[in-house]
């Protein structure tokens, strides 16, 4: 279980030890990233040689984290304290641009009584 910006985020439909008391709607956060010439040149050279293109891997990892953060902030705006069923979607926007989109169901949860 991960907490981002004070929001619990999980990929499952339930959170052990908690119950969902209210559904607030879809929380979403997206980011579009484009590479720059230096990264493109390094990527081209790595592509010729083969292997992982670390410049793009790092860029996409940063974009995923930012999309998650934006989704958590949107969930907070909706009045939620958790996001369940979180997923990522990616889109190639042409050239060297890509969109990373994080989304899930914003909910209010409470601890279950034992």
Curated annotation (Swiss-Prot):
Gene3D superfamilies assigned to the protein according to its UniProt record, in alphabetical order: Hypothetical protein apc22750. Chain B
Family: Belongs to the UPF0145 family.
Name of the protein in question: UPF0145 protein PYRAB04900
Coiled coil: none
Top-level taxon of origin: Archaea
Organism of provenance: Pyrococcus abyssi (strain GE5 / Orsay)
Entries under HAMAP family matching the protein: UPF0145 (MF_00338)
């Amino acid at each position: 279980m991960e907490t981002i910006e004070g929001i619990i985020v999980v990929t499952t439909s339930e959170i052990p030890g908690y119950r969902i008391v209210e559904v607030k709607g879809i929380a979403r956060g997206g980011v579009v990233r484009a590479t720059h010439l230096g990264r493109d040149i390094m990527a081209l050279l790595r592509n010729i040689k083969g292997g992982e293109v670390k410049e793009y891997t790092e860029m996409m990892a940063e974009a995923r984290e930012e999309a998650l953060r934006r989704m958590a902030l949107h969930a907070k705006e909706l009045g939620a304290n958790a996001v369940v069923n979180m997923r990522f979607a990616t889109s190639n926007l042409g050239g060297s641009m890509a969109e990373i989109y994080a989304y899930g169901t914003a909910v209010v949860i409470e601890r279950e009584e034992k």
